[in-house]
Amino acid sequence: MKHLFKIFVLGLMVLVSGCGDWLDIKPQTESKEDDLFAKEQGFKDALIGAYIQMKQNSLYGQNLTYTTLEYLAQHWNYSLVTYEENLSTYVYSDAIVEATFSSVYEQWYKVILSCNNILNNIDGRKDVFTKKYYELVKGEALAIRAFMHFDV
């Protein structure tokens, strides 16, 4: 009986003390800022991420190229009473119109935040860059951020 009790206590101690590492799992698609900006490739990945955010449907993938803006400018005709008519007649209180503009502004500021993260880290880590990539990455991040602010 004592032997069984010792095994039980030992097993309980292993389970209680050993679970912390198993529960601390980092998702493969996320990375910590320090890890991301430790190498030149991390800065490039962050910049590519900003471009990918820009091509979302809520920004230049749809709303700010050929749908929402066209209805606001009244370039397109619509056949039914829909949110497109509300866009064309500037009824901004419509729930779908509000959601559309909310997603546009939210995505704009996500892109600005991504560029700000790059710019906050790039000057302190010039040593990780080769050739002229420092100027290239910093210039593109500044340009994207300026473009987003201009469009807002």
Sequence positions of predicted segments:
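Sec-dependent signal peptide recognition
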Residues: 2-10
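Secretory-pathway/luminal and periplasmic proteins that interact with or process carbohydrate-rich
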Residues: 55-61, 75-78, 148-152
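Conserved, well-structured interaction surfaces
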Residues: 44, 82-152
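Acidic helix-start/capping segments at beta-turn-to-alpha-helix junctions
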Residues: 67-74, 137
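Membrane-proximal, proline-rich intrinsically disordered regions
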Residues: 19-67
